[in-house]
């Protein structure tokens, strides 16, 4: 029996000593600092037998943890500019590329819920934090298509054709419901397709106020490019959606693709 008590004390005393260090402010987790739990940042609000940690951007974002659960964790000082979460409820985000566009409906420590045309879907918040998130409600963003026309138009591609397409896109996109939030149209020759076509990038940059219309922008640009082709008699080869965040990336991808094919 005595041996059992000694053996138990041998195993528990080191952990108990670590808890005492935490309470006295000498441990690796300190009040007022930032700590990660399941990939989610929290601010250590209070240290005690039960400690309180908070993420201000999460619904139900206050955790109450027994002190022993903090043993083995490590906090750090943080800067006020550091975000506590990639987005807030109501924001529109792109997840792992331009094709997955969702509105954030609810975010808790366990689950992030999205709204997509009145349909709900969710994923564990820890998984969401591991994805590539682009918050288009927080910063200007790009939307666009690649528009391919016949190679026979090559002699005017860098002159009259590009100028006409650029002007047409600029005029027509501003007629859309979100037109006042369009910052900059970008039309340029991006490269050559495998089928002897000329591929143009047709992009627009929009302010965050237009984030709720992101889903319509690529479709609207397709309609606008089609109308331009019909007006000026250009032979269309294809339209192609893009899955990058900026037109320069689209251009690089096309150049690499052309090199690989060659």
Residues covered by each model-derived region:
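Structured, soluble regulatory/oligomerization domains located on the cytosolic or IMS-facing side
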Residues: 1-5, 11-29, 37-42, 48-49, ...
């Amino acid at each position: 029996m005595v041996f059992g008590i000694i053996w138990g004390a041998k195993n528990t005393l080191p952990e108990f000593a670590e808890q005492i260090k935490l309470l006295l402010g000498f441990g690796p987790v300190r009040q007022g600092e930032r700590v990660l739990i399941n990939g989610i940042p929290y601010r250590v609000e209070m240290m005690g037998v039960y400690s309180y940690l908070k993420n201000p951007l999460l619904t139900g974002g206050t955790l109450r943890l027994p002190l022993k659960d903090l043993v083995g964790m490590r906090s750090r000082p943080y800067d006020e500019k550091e975000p506590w979460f990639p987005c807030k409820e109501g924001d529109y985000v792109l997840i792992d590329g331009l094709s997955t566009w969702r509105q954030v409906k609810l975010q808790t420590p366990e689950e992030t819920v999205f709204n997509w045309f009145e349909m709900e879907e969710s994923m564990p918040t820890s998984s969401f934090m591991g994805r590539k998130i682009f918050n288009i409600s927080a910063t200007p963003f790009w939307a666009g298509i690649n528009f391919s026309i016949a190679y026979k138009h090559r002699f005017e591609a860098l002159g009259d054709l590009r100028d006409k397409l650029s002007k047409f896109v600029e005029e027509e996109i501003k007629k859309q419901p979100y037109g006042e939030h369009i910052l900059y149209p970008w039309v340029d020759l991006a490269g050559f397709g495998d089928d002897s076509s000329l591929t143009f990038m047709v992009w627009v940059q929009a302010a965050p106020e237009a984030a709720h219309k992101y889903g319509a922008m690529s479709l609207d640009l397709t309609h606008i490019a089609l109308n331009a082709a019909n007006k000026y008699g250009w032979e269309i080869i294809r339209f192609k959606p893009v899955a990058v965040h900026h037109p320069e990336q689209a251009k690089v991808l096309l150049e690499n693709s052309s090199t690989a094919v060659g």
